[in-house]
Amino acid sequence: MTQKEAIEYAINLAKKANENEIRPNPFVGAVIIDHEGQLIGEGYHQKLGGPHAEVYAIDQALQKTSDLSQATIYVSLEPCSHYGKTPPCVDLIIQHKIKKVVIASLDPNPKVASVAKLMEHGIEVEVVDDVSANLLNNRFFTNQLKNRPHYILKLASTIDGKIADYAKNSQWISSVASRQFVHDHLRANVDAIMTSYKTLVQDQASLTIRNTGGAIQEANVIVIDKNLELLEKQYESLPIFYPRSVTKIIFIAANPPSIQLPENTACIIGTFNEQGLVFSSIAAKLLELGYYKILTEAGSQLNSSMIQQNTADELYWFIAPSILNDLNAVPMLGLDTKITLDKKVQLSLIETKLIDQDVLLHYRFN
């Protein structure tokens, strides 16, 4: 097995994990190749608090040989060197005198710093900085480097960039298949769905997760509601207030509530300006609550505000094969700003996908 093949193998192993089972940890895969180029051990991180990829790979390799001093371990992410829920993987690599460690992606956590420790013990280290490995853990990197949740922005529009008609009717622009994709691949794989109270009132949304078989699953919902207007009696029958057993509605408001909050709800106090919520004011609290990855499904103003504040990390844009051709229709982005081309927001395309007759463009923000 070549180095390129081993790295690709480790990355594909890492992808086997269910992110909901490992978050906030990253995806990690590891393979061990002996001096003859044969695969003798492999593994991936499967569950938060469970063994790391390197542990599985080394345990498997030791079933075939007691001597790993001529072996190379390939890891999709830099091995940990600090105590967390499990012991450091670096110590295990050193203990078994593995000859070489090839790292596809460095860990941004300053506590890790395993490269220096490995080299101090005479172990050869090579960092290849693989693009696929870096993309795999973009959520983890956001959490570590920016100390905030990783935000995914979801948009569904006509070809001319409209998300609703002049009367604010938006149901439905995208196809049934596209909407199911959102449930299966986006809502089901985040810690919470973020929206605004205006969107909930306008769309009468429940923001649940509906699988292809029709079963409905609860989802945590974060509602940006500066003045807690959604708590007014006229809105108490909105679909979002369905009985919850394992999830919560988190309100983000400018001031504490003056009334008792409904069951399974909580309130975070954030800072607001003329353009809405200042996202940095709630970042630490959301991480504290365990919301590491958040999907935003909202209107044009919130979409624009997130982009302007450099808060959006990924964009899933569903483009329907239709045109409204109306200046009065609701645009997908909606801040009244005058931006010159030199200040445009740059994105990188990750994937394009045809879903029924809709086009899905998946981007990351640079």
List the predicted regions and their residue ranges.
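Zn2+-dependent cytidine deaminase-like catalytic core
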Residues: 36-134, 220, 307
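Enzymes that bind and transform nitrogen-containing heteroaromatic metabolites
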Residues: 3-25, 41, 85, 150, ...
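N-terminal glycine-rich anion-binding loops that anchor highly charged ligand groups
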Residues: 22-38
